[in-house]
Amino acid sequence: MTLVDKFVTHVISESSFEEMDRIYLTNRVLARVGEGVLEVETNLDKLIDLKDQLVEEAVRLETIEDSQTAREILGTELMDLVTPCPSQVNRDFWEAYAYSPEQAIEDFYQLSQKNDYIKLKAIAKNIAYRVPSDYGELEITINLSKPEKDPKEIAVAKLVQASNYPQCQLCLENEGYHGRVNHPARSNHRIIRFEMVGQEWGFQYSPYAYFNEHCIFLDGQHRPMAISRQSFERLLAIVEQFPGYFAGSNADLPIVGGSILTHDHYQGGRHVFPMELAPLQKTFRFAGFEQVKAGIIKWPMSVLRLTSDSKEDLINLADKIFQEWRQYSDSSVQILAETDGTPHHTITPIARKRDGQFELDLVLRDNQTSAEHPDGIYHPHKDVQHIKKENIGLIEVMGLAILPPRLKEEVEQVASYLVGEAVTVADYHQEWADQLKSQHPDLTDKEKALAIVKDSVGAIFVRVLEDAGVYKQTEQGQTAFMRFVEQVGISLD
């Protein structure tokens, strides 16, 4: 069977198109790929593989230029053929939701995979493993899924006239957007609309998912990230409306925030993070909120866990803690609320439902800098930045490291260095590599060396999180943490 015939057959079987539409669909494909593809045969069977072959044929026929951007634009246009229009996707979702919210979510997740919006083939390239630590097993990933632009495309992007449409990658206007060299193609993108606390929000999946069913909840309006009482209301509303999913927010200040601060959004999904499994190491009750179970969890960052069957109580208490933290200083442990009116304190909040109760984890954040730590006092320090120097956002806070692609080769190079196969490593890894070599001077087995290096990466990630923690895991640090808790007000009954 020809490539076009096979692709069109798949489109008909996996969409609302019918056999009568075959000629129409064939012509839609030829218009995008080029008529020279008509006689091309294929032995591929899967829809996404067929799409990929059509894209390569378009490059061969010079219908599109040989660039990553052109490939992505054509690929999303082809997959748009198997994707219902936004109104139909939303209608299907809410009709299914009326009978089973879980089924509605599952159907939308399956659609987002089937139409290649979630890049399963790319995500499969990621390296992922677990490492033991004093805080339980942590998750390490080396992110290889996001394609890196080649130098030619980066140069072209600099010459492209600035555009404010869409305003950012999280705006609703991305739905169906054609794409350009400096903005991703989104022809096959669909967003579920829903109302939350009186405003329109959107629900979509992340194309380059970091964990199972990684999704994004985005404000219908282009408004900046802001942690407030409304954040706690919305996060708890999400975990109630989207059963089985957690929901969390990045912090809203530089250094301790995420990569997108210009558009209010939350992340969620169906994944149990290491932090969720962390036990309470100290429990107490806050005054006026005696019915809310509260405590500090055993975690490298500073986390208060609140549990209750009352959303209202959790929202009120979380807001009280947040407001107190924003203005709280303790010079004995280098904690400062503001400098000349510039705030330093915020929270990374995470919500979930567990055993029928609502749960909020409030991670205390401080974005101060100093002469010794110009990148951030509570940010990965210089000696661990060879592994992780980016902001510690929501996902890392919960115990999942997202490490840069360079580490794939660099980890292997350090392992080769340990067994004497390589004489050099990257300059920024030299001290680390020498330290490992002195600890394991007689290593000859490359696989064993690789395991040692990967475990060491995990140990460094623990340090990264400890650096980001405002109250350290020391007697002084934990005593200071309790001073803050007492400042909020605990029940002495």
From Swiss-Prot:
Reactions catalysed, as given in the entry: alpha-D-galactose 1-phosphate + UDP-alpha-D-glucose = alpha-D-glucose 1-phosphate + UDP-alpha-D-galactose
Matches recorded under Pfam families: GalP_UDP_tr_C (PF02744), GalP_UDP_transf (PF01087)
Location in the cell: Cytoplasm
Listed GO CC annotations: cytoplasm
Cited NCBIfam families: galT_2, PRK05270.1-1, PRK05270.1-2, PRK05270.1-5, PRK05270.2-2
InterPro entries in the record: GalP_uridyl_Trfase_II (IPR000766), GalP_uridyl_Trfase_II_CS (IPR023425), GalP_Utransf_C (IPR005850), GalP_Utransf_N (IPR005849)
Entry EC no(s): 2.7.7.12
Keyword Thylakoid applies: no
Molecular function terms from GO: UDP-glucose:hexose-1-phosphate uridylyltransferase activity
The protein's name in its UniProt record: Galactose-1-phosphate uridylyltransferase
Entry's family note: Belongs to the galactose-1-phosphate uridylyltransferase type 2 family.
Pathway as given in its UniProt record: Carbohydrate metabolism; galactose metabolism
Keywords from the named record: Carbohydrate metabolism, Cytoplasm, Galactose metabolism, Nucleotidyltransferase, Transferase
PROSITE patterns: GAL_P_UDP_TRANSF_II (PS01163)
Enzyme class: transferase
GO aspect biological process, one term: galactose metabolic process
